[in-house]
Amino acid sequence: MFTLKKSLLLLFFLGTISLSLCEEERDADEDEGEMTEEEVKRSVLGTVKDLLIGAGKSAAQSVLTTLSCKLSNSC
């Protein structure tokens, strides 16, 4: 009887540990999913920012070209 109780106690202990590890992995997976959404938002904002900077540089370059042309009367 004592051996049976010992075995059941050992099984209960091992089951509790494995359940705890599974819950930790599940929590870690959920956290990784949140980071992915955050990274997507950052990449979209980064792309929009890069496009706006490129458009601003292009507009500034065309304005400067026009001004230099008019100032030097070479248009």
Curated annotation (Swiss-Prot):
Pfam families assigned to the protein according to its UniProt record, in alphabetical order: Antimicrobial_2, FSAP_sig_propep
Single Gene Ontology BP annotation: defense response to Gram-positive bacterium
Tissue: Expressed by the skin glands.
Signal sequence bounds: 1-22
InterPro entries assigned: Antimicrobial_frog_2 (IPR012521), Frog_antimicrobial_propeptide (IPR004275)
Main location: secreted
Keyword Cell membrane attached: no
Keyword Thylakoid: no
Disulphides: C69-C75
Subcellular location: Secreted
Function summary: Has antimicrobial activity against Gram-negative bacterium E.coli ATCC 8739 (MIC=50 ug) and against Gram positive bacteria S.aureus ATCC 6538 (MIC=25 ug). Has no activity against methicillin-resistant S.aureus ATCC 43300, B.subtilis ATCC 6633 and against fungus C.albicans ATCC 90028.
Similarity comment: Belongs to the frog skin active peptide (FSAP) family. Brevinin subfamily.
UniProt-recorded name of the protein: Brevinin-2ISc
